[in-house]
Amino acid sequence: MSNASKFGKVAVLFGGKSAERDVSLDSGQAVLDALLRSGVQAEAFDPKERSVTELVGYDRAFIVLHGRGGEDGQIQGVLEWLDIPYTGTGVQGSAIGMDKIKTKQIWQGSDLPTAPYRIVSKDSDLNEIVASLGLPVIIKPVHEGSSIGMSKVEKIEDFAPAIEKATAHDAIVMAEKWITGREYTIVVLNGKALPVIRLQPPQDVAFYDYDAKYQRNDVQYGIPSGLSDSDEKKLQELTLRAFHTVGASGWGRVDAMQDEHGNFWLLEINTVPGMTSHSLVPKAAQAIGIDFDALCVEILAQTLTGLAH
């Protein structure tokens, strides 16, 4: 890339200590390689291996840390304290986006449609939860990404093992109403919603889980999504409202469902989405003619324009 020197010395932050470390290592290496190919003076920086105080001396940071510590406002706060511009969402938006319940509360308060939920524990009145949400439900740790610790529950006796599995990853666990229909993901880049992607996991997968996201090669990605032009536009507009309402900025991804009646339901937001070979952000960018190297440079360039922090 011409004029790559304007970025100065760039720390590509990846790895970290969260349950998503392995995904972050793959994503971060891909981003690092892309920036180096583009002539950027980029270096790997793993906060698990090095003290964040060593970030002094870098001119800006490209955050590719997934999950807690990297996607929840912590590293963003450190970078602001060090006065280092960084990619993506700021401290508050990151903290909200990492918390599925806070995200839903803000969406609900803004009259945005999101799947109904309840906080659950091993002591919860399961009959009351089933009466409220119906069956099936999906059990989720509130502060994990990449579908880690998630389970589909189809009968009441399946609650206990599902809650136990989720509790292994997070002290706070939620049950979310199962939306029967089609799953979509929408990438936001520089204030615009990119073409909607339809996710079609294989028949033997209950939902778009960790294996489907990162291990399997038989997941189908629909670009174009198959939605009508009006529904595509409606979902893109809904995504932008959802993205900005939680205080997200720069780049990210919103997951949504369309139920059997054609209604859209917001599920969650990812403020530092995956950038692996299986990941959805590169697929959406490719659909509008932005290759991976150009995508990484465009995200980094947000640190120059005020679109990021």
From Swiss-Prot:
Residues binding ATP, per UniProt: 130-185
Gene3D superfamilies, alphabetized: 3.40.50.20, ATP-grasp fold, B domain (3.30.470.20)
GO MF entries: ATP binding; D-alanine-D-alanine ligase activity; metal ion binding
Biological function: Cell wall formation.
Main location: cytoplasm
Positions contributing to Mg(2+) 2 binding: 268, 270
EC number, as in UniProt: 6.3.2.4
Keyword set includes Ligase: yes
Reaction(s) the record says it catalyses: 2 D-alanine + ATP = D-alanyl-D-alanine + ADP + phosphate + H(+)
PROSITE patterns according to UniProt: ATP_GRASP (PS50975), DALA_DALA_LIGASE_1 (PS00843), DALA_DALA_LIGASE_2 (PS00844)
Source organism of this protein record: Acinetobacter baylyi (strain ATCC 33305 / BD413 / ADP1)
All copies of domain ATP-grasp, residue ranges: 104-301
Keywords noted in UniProt: ATP-binding, Cell shape, Cell wall biogenesis/degradation, Cytoplasm, Ligase, Magnesium, Manganese, Metal-binding, Nucleotide-binding, Peptidoglycan synthesis
Plastid is among the record's keywords: no
Full protein name: D-alanine--D-alanine ligase
